[in-house]
């Protein structure tokens, strides 16, 4: 029932010294390791083929070790040899291919079954476009699988601190070290290789990450499709080779959410057995009446349960109720007038903000300042300088911001190794429509010019303190992100959001992150990778609520159009450097200063992660930020007392 397929590889690794495989003095050692492996493991049925080693070149020593395997056992033998092991392998194999090259080898490689022995290099913020790889693999006739490099970050605690019992910094970061904390030899990376020991989809302490969420989703062997919102039915395809999906050891569960809040949940007590390699359509007993006032979503899960009738027992490795496969679909009718969205699994639509009318309050304008009182009698004030930059925003006498909105394109991750965009977090501003009353409201427009992008912000101020920012970006070069940055005041630590989550996700790594309503803190939104880099993005933003418990003030933000967000207490300019300079530093999370203010990004688009920290694709074209055209979103801000209902203005 555990179902592991194992490639068993001999401990033969030359790496930088690949000429050893052509040196006859090494034949005995290489052959001995290979022979002992086969003799040790050949009675394990989970071993489906052998591998002669890794990155040792294509020398003739492998003729000997290949024949040793074949003389001892009949299973296939694999060897990649950094691209030069074709003559000693029953499989076609390579490392870190691009998605397009995988697509070109869907019938096999070198006339043999194709095995991708390393791909999706998972160093840092990574595992982009995994879905696109598997679209090719699952649509092939000759590809047998692929291995992510690799499972776990292999950092250790700083030995100097560990001896005195220090594992974590004052800010809660682990004192993990990487190769950069050790000296290289003769200026070459022998023995340490910088951050290359940290390629895992989980952290050194085995913490789940957004990378693992994506892998779990893309790799799941049960697929949900063809959901009918009217019939409440879904097709379930069993991609397992041998195992049936039966109500004897699984249950199908569903949860219905209205604007991210749970309104119904249930399970199918029984369903028809789905044989391996087949599919069936099931109907869910959903009772929720769907209207056009909200976004309705349904999450469907295949969960493990205690077996009956002699079925395989999956609870030997996971708790009862654990989901081995899931999907999310929209129940809403598409209606752009009220912000509902309709899409298929992984491609939900973007929200649309309805027009807004203030329910009470009063508003005054003087020079570049908006003041007023909301419908709860709380005073507010918003101040701009002569260029149109927001310099102050208060509510009930409490500061809401530390710095107003400005263009921000800072973004750097390990996979940006071959990508060196311009960075900017400030712009030249000018007022194009002076602040003035417009009926009961007030309006103001500002133009901004930053490196690689111009933009406009059209402000609408409502008497109850609600503020709309309609932002239009016009990029002129390929940037890492297109969006606004701003700083909220100290104390806005508690977070509720309606977006993809709960873990970080990106445009090309969001298949395994579903829309939902989640609660957390700004500190807990850090992705603690060993090497500091951009983190915490949440795609398909609908709503964000920040609460300052000390001042009893809450800021609600709703998005209209394409938008994502991230929050942080750390200054990204400390690690976002041009070129490959971030690859040559000892910087750790615990070296960074935690600031009291909250750095916020509201992006129209952030570049996908890709796979370029080691081979692969830098970023697929559909996930790259546009370099021309105009792109718009609207952010609707509503300050209120924290004891008020947690609903942003509709």
Positions of predicted regions on the chain:
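An acidic- and aromatic-residue-enriched active-site/binding cleft used to recognize and process polar
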Residues: 11, 52-55, 82, 97, ...
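A generic structural signal for short, non-catalytic loop/turn and secondary-structure boundary residues
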Residues: 5, 85-87, 109, 194, ...
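Solvent-exposed, well-ordered amphipathic alpha-helical segments
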Residues: 25-35, 52, 58-70, 79-87, ...
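Carbohydrate-binding surfaces of carbohydrate-active enzymes
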Residues: 136-390, 469, 645-646
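Extended substrate-binding grooves/exosites of carbohydrate-active enzymes
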Residues: 1-235, 239-247, 253-264
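Beta-strand/loop-rich accessory regions of lumenal/periplasmic or secreted enzymes
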Residues: 285-293, 308, 333-650
């Amino acid at each position: 029932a555990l179902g592991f397929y194992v490639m068993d590889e001999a401990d033969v690794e030359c790496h930088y010294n690949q000429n050893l495989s052509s040196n006859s003095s090494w034949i005995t050692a290489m052959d001995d390791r290979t022979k002992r492996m086969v003799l040790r493991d050949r009675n394990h049925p989970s071993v489906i083929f052998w591998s002669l080693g890794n990155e040792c070149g294509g020398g003739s020593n492998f003729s000997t070790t290949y024949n040793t395997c074949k003389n001892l056992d009949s299973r296939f033998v694999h060897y990649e040899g950094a691209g030069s092991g074709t003559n000693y392998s029953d499989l076609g194999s390579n490392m870190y291919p691009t998605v397009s090259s995988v697509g070109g080898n869907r019938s096999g490689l070198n006339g043999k079954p194709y095995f991708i022995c390393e791909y999706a290099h998972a160093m840092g913020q990574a595992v982009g476009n995994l879905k696109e790889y598997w679209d090719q693999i699952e649509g092939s006739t000759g590809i047998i699988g692929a291995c992510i490099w690799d499972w776990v970050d292999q950092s250790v605690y700083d030995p100097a601190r560990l001896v005195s019992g220090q594992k974590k910094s004052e800010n809660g970061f682990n004192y993990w070290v990487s190769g950069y904390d050790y000296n290289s030899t003769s200026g070459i990376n022998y023995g340490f290789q910088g951050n290359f020991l940290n390629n895992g989809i989980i952290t050194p302490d085995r913490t789940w990450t957004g990378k693992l969420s994506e892998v779990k989703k893309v790799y799941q062997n049960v697929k949900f499709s063809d959901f009918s919102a009217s019939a409440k039915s879904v097709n379930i395809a069993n991609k397992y080779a041998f195992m049936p999906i039966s109500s004897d050891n699984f249950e199908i569960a569903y949860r219905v959410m209205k604007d991210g809040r749970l309104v119904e949940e249930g399970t199918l007590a029984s369903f028809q057995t789905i044989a391996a390699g087949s599919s069936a359509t099931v109907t869910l007993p959903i009772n929720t009446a769907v209207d056009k006032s909200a976004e309705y979503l349904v999450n469907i899960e295949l969960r493990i349960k205690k077996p009956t009738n002699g079925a395989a027992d999956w609870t030997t490795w996971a708790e009862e109720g654990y989901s081995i496969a899931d999907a999310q679909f929209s129940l809403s009718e598409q209606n752009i007038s009220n912000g509902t969205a309709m899409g298929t699994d992984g491609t939900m639509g973007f929200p649309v903000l309805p027009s807004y009318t203030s329910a009470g309050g009063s508003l005054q304008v003087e020079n570049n300042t908006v003041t007023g009182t909301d419908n709860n009698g709380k005073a507010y004030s918003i101040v701009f300088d002569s260029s149109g930059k927001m310099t102050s925003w208060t509510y009930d006498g409490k500061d809401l911001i530390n710095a107003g909105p400005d263009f921000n394109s800072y973004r750097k991750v390990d996979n940006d190794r071959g990508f060196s965009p311009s960075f900017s977090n400030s712009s030249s501003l000018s007022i194009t429509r002076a602040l003035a009353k417009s009926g009961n409201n007030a309006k103001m427009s500002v133009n901004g010019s930053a490196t690689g992008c111009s933009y406009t912000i059209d402000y609408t101020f409502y008497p109850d303190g609600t503020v709309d920012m309609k932002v239009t970006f016009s990029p002129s070069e390929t940037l890492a992100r297109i969006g606004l940055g701003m700083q909220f005041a100290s104390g806005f630590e508690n977070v509720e959001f309606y977006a993809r989550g709960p873990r970080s996700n990106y445009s090309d790594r969001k298949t395994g992150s579903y829309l939902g309503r989640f609660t957390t803190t700004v500190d807990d939104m850090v992705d603690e990778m060993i090497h500091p880099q951009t983190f915490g993005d949440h795609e398909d933003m609908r709503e964000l609520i920040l609460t300052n418990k000390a001042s009893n003030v809450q800021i609600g933000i709703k998005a209209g159009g394409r938008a994502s967000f991230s929050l942080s207490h750390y200054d990204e300019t400390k690690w976002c450097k041009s070129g490959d300079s971030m690859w040559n530093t000892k910087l750790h999370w615990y070296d960074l200063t935690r600031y009291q203010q909250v750095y916020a990004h509201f992006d129209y688009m952030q570049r996908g992660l890709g796979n370029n920290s080691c081979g692969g694709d830098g970023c697929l074209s559909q996930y790259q930020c546009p370099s021309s055209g105009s792109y718009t979103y609207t952010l609707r801000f509503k300050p209120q007392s924290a004891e008020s209902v947690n609903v942003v203005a509709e």
